[in-house]
């Protein structure tokens, strides 16, 4: 799969021990913030994302800073939809806003790069809803399948992913791209963490 090969070749999928936003320790890390450095695969990923959401009824896109903003921006331009973004915490200067958009009365597509437990996504949903918007769906490039879909479901928000981590890792586990030791660490993590 070109996407997965590109992730590995460009060091966007890293193998090791990484602390995630959720606090979990993972034997792999997806650094999709840099995917836009590789236009061809980035553009292909955006096209696949658009294909996944083409039947969703929304009128504004909100990207989660920072990983979701490049994807949200390209999708917004290609689909002709207004764009805003949301931070996970106040910046402490300027207007000190968390949400940079007028979402009142709008149906929102929330966009991020990766979903793990759904903590950041659900926080964004709460903020957008409190500002009068309604998140109708959330799009991520990769769902790590560690609870985000269930968490968003509690808010009535559907999680849509371009890729599931299971398909990415299964490809890796059946390839010669990583060592046997790394394969074993990933298998162990999958058993313990993937829904």
Curated annotation (Swiss-Prot):
Its EC number is 2.4.2.10. One of its GO terms (biological process) is 'de novo' UMP biosynthetic process. Keywords: Glycosyltransferase, Magnesium, Pyrimidine biosynthesis, Transferase. Catalyzes the transfer of a ribosyl phosphate group from 5-phosphoribose 1-diphosphate to orotate, leading to the formation of orotidine monophosphate (OMP). Pathway: Pyrimidine metabolism; UMP biosynthesis via de novo pathway; UMP from orotate: step 1/2. Belongs to the purine/pyrimidine phosphoribosyltransferase family. PyrE subfamily. It is an enzyme of class 2 (transferase). HAMAP family: PyrE. It catalyses: orotidine 5'-phosphate + diphosphate = orotate + 5-phospho-alpha-D-ribose 1-diphosphate. It comes from the Archaea. Homodimer. SUPFAM superfamilies: PRTase-like. Its cofactor is Mg(2+). CDD domains: PRTases_typeI. 5-phospho-alpha-D-ribose 1-diphosphate binds at residues 87, 91, 112-120. This is Orotate phosphoribosyltransferase. The gene is pyrE. InterPro entries: OPRT, Or_phspho_trans_dom, PRibTrfase_dom, PRTase-like. One of its GO terms (molecular function) is magnesium ion binding. Orotate binds at residues 116, 144.
